[in-house]
Amino acid sequence: TDENSVEYGLKDKLFFQESAQYLEQLPQPFYAKFITVSNHFPFPEDEMNNTFTLDTGDETIDGYFNTARYADEALAEFFQYMKDAGLYDNTLFVLYGDHFGISSSRNETLAPLIGANPDLWGAYDDAMMQRVPFIIHNPGSGTGQISDVYGGQIDILPTVMHLLGVDTSAYVQLGQDLMSAQNEGIVVFRNGSIVTSEYTILGNTVYHTQTGTLAYQTEEVVEKVAQIRAQAELQLAISDQITNGDLLRFYTPDGFTPVDKSLHNYVDSPARLAEDIAELGNLNTSLYYTNNGVSSVPLYQTDAPEFPGNQVIADENVTHGQPVAVEAPAE
C-alpha cells in the first residue's frame, strides 16, 4: 500500500520484517541480499517516521538525515532478530551504499553540517562526497577497527571471498582484497576521476588527498600521476571490453554453472522456494526446518507505526514521536 511504501518499494522496517519469513526458509549456509530504499532520493517526508528533525532550508538534505536515522533503526531491529533467531553468530554481514547520498548541487548547503566552509567548497570536496559507507561485521571476531584503505565496490567480492576462506586464484577478478598488504588502493570513477591515498586526480587537476590542497607538478608528482592514470585507463578499458563485448558469456571456470535467466522471476520466487524445500526433504538445513517447523517470525520486533499492533501517539510532548506498541483491539 502507499502507506507502507516509498518511491522504490517497501519502507525498510517493514521490508526487513516481511523478509524474515523467507530468510528462515533458506538452506544454510545461504547468501541473502537486501536492497533497502528508504534512505534514497528524493527522501520523501514521512510524518509517521519522522524521528530526526532538521531544518537546513533544504527539504532534500533534511529528508536525507531523517531517512538515514530511520534506516539505522531498521537495521538495529534486523540485527536483533538475527540474534533472537539464532542466526547472528554464524553470519557475515556486509553493508554498503551503492552510490553517493546527496547530489553535488546541494553540497554547499550541506557543507556547514560537516564542518566545511561553503564559500571554499570546490571540485575536490565534491569528489570526497562520492564516498559511501562500507561495513563488514563478523560476530565474534573481536574488537572492530576503522580501515583507511582506499577502495571501491569492485573490491568487495575478493575481500569477502577471502574472509570466507575461498581460494580465488582460479578466478578472474578485477577488484582487490582490501585487507591484503598488496592492495594498491586505487579508486577509478567512470568519468576518469581517480582517488588514491596520496592523490585525487580530477581531469588535469591533481590534489593531495589527505589535505585537499593542490599538488605542485614536480617531476616526481608528474611521474606518479602518470603511473596512476595508466592503471586507471587499463581498468576502464577492461571494463568496457567485458561490458560492450558481453565477454562474460565465455567465462566458465570449473564448477561454474551459468545462470539461466529464464528461470528467475521475482513474482514466482516464493513458489520456487517452496519447491526447492520440498525437494530437499530431510536434507533441509533451513532455520525453520531445524526448529522443527517452529517459525522465528514472531521473534521479529518492530516499532514501525504501519505494522499491525503499533500505534503512533500524536502528542507534541512525546519524545521524537516514537511509536508505542499496543495490543491489537479485540474483534
Regions found by a protein language model. Name each.
Residues 1-331:
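Solvent-exposed soluble domains appended to multi-pass membrane proteins
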